[in-house]
Amino acid sequence: MTQPSARFTLITAARLLDGTGAAAVEQAALLIDGDRVADLGRASHVHVADGASVERRDYGAATILPGLVDAHTHLVAPGDGTLGDDVAREDDDILLLQAAKNARTLLHSGVTTLRENGAKGKVAFSLREGVRRQLAPGPRMVICGRPIAITGGHMGYFGSEADGEAAVRAEVRKLLKEGADYIKIVASGGSTRTSDPNRASYTVAELAAMTDEAHRHGKLTAAHCTSAQSVQNCLDADVDMVIHCIFNEPDGTYRFRPDLVARLAAARAWVNPTLYVMKAGIERQREVREREGRLTPELTAQLDAARRALDVRVDAVRRMSEAGVRMTAGSDSPWGWYAPGEFVHEIHMLAQAGLSYADAVVAGTAGAAESIGVGTLAGRLARGRPADALVVRGDPTRDITALWDVLDVYQAGRRVERGVA
């Protein structure tokens, strides 16, 4: 859980990143008053009133930055290669325990805010409430509750299948009544056995009905898109975020679409490319199957083809970014083979796709927070804002892998007890 603190906590380090991409403040200090940032800047300019109760922590050559914001998680999954179809067969009580375990793991890794992109039944709602009541440790949660899918579509097994304009609009209203913070739409097929990832699922009219209803209530929309037609449909329907953004044709071939990229940039839509979930599936499946003696020539060929497809996707993200498309960091973990607590892998992949280390850090802090609608609450260190902070050894703007070396995590001004000496 979290450790109680004096009214003021003063932490100092070699540098501070505020999450916006501004130059680092050298010889920095962050002053916390309760659950808020009271002051920040050069240590010589940050002062505590005489006689005030203050706890001081000096981290030497480390970096202070905002708590990370993972814009895409599925907390009910174990991250061990279990298919979503099989995850959905578990009892909700077991899934809630799995989700609580994953939430704690993410918090300990430095993620202080997350967007939950689809769970079964009431699991996400229950976990969010449990974290709010401090019954279980976890990041601030932005949830959709359940993704809306066509009958037999990807993730329909989580409990929100709807078809037709009236039915999908009603499903949006139902989820908002239950307490959804945003609406997740499955605009194409995916890994679900009864779906086709290369084809669009919803029509433009159905997508527009969901987006209109969400926007009428002041809520954002995000859509899973693994086909070019689904991306085009979502642009036509004014969806706020395109997830995966894969330009596959119905026959499974990939063709980069400069026309759609230009529209994404012009619309200021966010793209969450989810690169590492694919890399994790390639690397970890190869490792596990080889250890089990089940790495067949056929599977090896499939994994080699997947690696080539990943290279194409990395290049596509680079080209989209160069065209002005806004990129947000969201892991998609612990889906598939992507283990929980490893969000840094996705941030690193964005850097490999052409973002500077500094911009990749922004994509996982202030940028991610803005993309999921909590830009005033998370992802940035500033006076008066929630004191969610991360301290890492080294400088992630020079070496992004420094984000792995977590010294401490602060949530609402309190140091998270991670069981680390």
Write out the residue ranges for each language-model feature:
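His/Asp/Glu-enriched, well-ordered alpha-helical/loop segment
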Residues: 216, 294-396, 415
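Histidine/acidic residue-rich metal-binding segments in metalloenzymes
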Residues: 126, 167-271, 285-295, 306-327
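Active-site mouth loops of central-metabolism enzymes
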Residues: 84-97, 153-170, 199, 220-222
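Active-site environment of divalent metal-dependent phosphoester hydrolases
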Residues: 76-79, 117-123, 149-150, 189-193, ...
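Metal-associated gating/positioning segment near the N- to mid-region
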Residues: 62-133, 154, 205, 226-237, ...
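Divalent metal-dependent hydrolysis catalytic cores, especially in the metallo-beta-lactamase
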Residues: 98-124, 138-149, 180-193, 219-220, ...
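Histidine-rich, glycine-flanked metal-binding segment
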Residues: 1-10, 16, 20-65, 85-86, ...
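Divalent metal-coordination and catalytic microenvironments
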Residues: 14, 30, 35, 61, ...
